[in-house]
Regions:
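Short hydrophobic targeting helices and cationic amphipathic motifs
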Residues: 5-8
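Glycine/small-residue-rich loop that forms an oxyanion/phosphate-binding "nest" at active or ligand-binding sites
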Residues: 87-136
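Glycine-rich, flexible N-terminal cofactor/catalytic loop recognition
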Residues: 23-80
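Conserved helicase motor
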Residues: 78-83, 158-159
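Class I SAM-dependent methyltransferase SAM-binding "motif I" and its flanking Rossmann-like core
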Residues: 117-174
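Cysteine-centered motifs
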Residues: 14, 20-22
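A contiguous loop/helix-start segment that scaffolds small-molecule binding in enzyme catalytic cores
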Residues: 177, 181-247
Length: 247
């Protein structure tokens, strides 16, 4: 495209930052809906439409979202298996003036999703990083749980094997509300383990399919909620909100 210059006191000020590479670009971290597409913000759509490059965890999954909102910008795969190899090239593109937007399959990148590495490298390089407010699964689950939400700790996915018992042991004295992500296939096993470590009467809320048609929160003691999901096979994305240790 053409570059417009404005003459001002013998200085030329470029009005097209990206095209002439006068300044460094920017990294936008853009949340995407965890369920209902209506949860996409106007600003998120605008940023994605204006980006020179969109980094997507899975280009096929994100392709559906982008097509829905008529976003046709260049997209590149960026996930935990390739981010160590691609991050340097992306940082260099931003340094050269490109605007890059990072999205994950659902929710806010970096929260139990790829994103930390590219953000850290951009910060190290002096690149401006802006994270848009938006969808993330654990906040609605926490607020709707009925458990104390003024202080909480987010644990994400527990280690599957090595370090799992150590992590659970370290949380036995935790007084804040705890938040975990889990797959439906491991839910009952994890809740049963919680009962062993935290006591069967500990209050819990299991929220699944957040912002989708079959959204559901099941609340009660660990014993009660284990019984429910033993009889009713859990499906969909799961957030476990567990009460902290009482004084």
């Amino acid at each position: 495209g053409t570059i417009n210059f404005m003459h001002l006191n013998s200085f030329y000020i470029c009005s097209s930052i990206t095209e002439c590479n006068c300044f460094m670009g920017k990294l936008y971290v853009v949340p995407t809906p965890v369920g209902n597409l209506e949860d996409m913000t106007f600003r998120a759509i605008r940023v994605l439409k204006e980006a020179d490059l969109i980094l997507a965890e899975d280009t096929r999954t994100s392709g559906i979202l982008l097509k829905h909102f008529e976003i046709k910008n260049a997209m590149q795969s960026h996930h935990k298996f390739n981010e160590h190899k691609t991050v340097e090239g992306i940082v260099n593109r931003i340094k050269a003036g490109e605007t890059v937007a990072l999205i994950s399959d659902a929710g806010t990148p970096g929260i139990s999703d790829p994103g930390f590495l590219i953000v850290r490298e951009c910060v190290k390089s002096g690149i401006e990083v802006q994270c848009l407010p938006g969808a993330t699964a654990f906040v609605p689950a926490l607020v709707a749980s009925g458990l104390p939400d003024e202080r909480f700790c987010f644990e994400g996915f527990l280690p599957q094997k090595k370090g799992r018992v150590t992590r659970l042991t370290s949380l036995q004295e935790e007084k804040r509300t705890m938040i975990f992500y889990e797959s439906p296939y491991r839910l009952v096993k994890t809740l049963t383990q919680f009962a062993e470590f935290f006591g069967a009467e500990r209050p819990v809320s299991v929220c699944r399919e957040i912002s989708k048609i079959h959204e559901e929160s099941v609340r009660g003691t660990l014993t009660e909620v284990i019984a429910h999901f033993t009889q009713n096979e859990p499906r969909g994305e799961i957030v476990i909100v567990l009460g902290g240790k009482e004084d």
